[in-house]
Amino acid sequence: EAAARAAMEMAGIGPETVGVCLVPTITADYITPSTACVLQNRLDLPEDTVCFDLNAACSGFVYGLHTAQALLAASPRKYGLVVCSEVLTRITNYTDRGTCILFGDGAAAAVVEYGETYPPMPTVLGARGTWDILNGPGINRGAEPVLYMEGTAVFRFAVETVPRCMDQVLDRAGLALEDVDEFVFHQANRRILEHIRKKC
């Protein structure tokens, strides 16, 4: 809520101008209602604001931006909120030292503005569901959910996939690598980012 209020204040917009409120999260407070609906009430957004959560893990913000852009094209209002929020301490396994050092709690929000004269935002999205890991098939691990990650596989996936996605999005935007002043990456791991930088 605080991140959303700060973003709206920085953008100089009031709640009545918001037509879309999206919350990318894997740690929502409730199964239902969605965190986005809770925010709609707390922020006093109009009742016809499109509100829902997105479960896309690390790629949630990118999915949120892409979805907000598409929804705003059909909205009577020109602003949307993308509010990323995670409370990963709820699901982190602190005995897994290779994983627990990567995660914490936090929230960030962005105001998205729709304009008919803006060029569409080139986006590359996708999924690779083959990498899910069932740790102990069919076993109920108890009341506390635990986040599990295969670090080496994640590293390989990131350093192979990110440069390819960069090439695709640059191609869709009609740009070359040299045309871009800054790239903003998901900050999961410094080694991954250094490897990508050298590769590009």
Please provide the spans of the model-predicted regions.
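Flexible, glycine-rich active-site loops centered on histidine and acidic residues
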Residues: 71-106
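Conserved active-site "lid/cap" helical segment
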Residues: 1-19, 139-181, 188-200
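Condensing-enzyme catalytic core mediating Claisen C-C bond formation in acyl metabolism
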Residues: 94-160, 164-167
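Acyl-CoA/ACP chain-elongation machinery
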Residues: 84, 129-133, 190
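Generic recognition of short, well-ordered alpha-helical segments
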Residues: 2, 34-37, 94, 195
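Short beta-strand segments
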Residues: 24, 55, 79-86, 112, ...
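Conserved catalytic cysteine-centered active-site region
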Residues: 26-79, 198-200
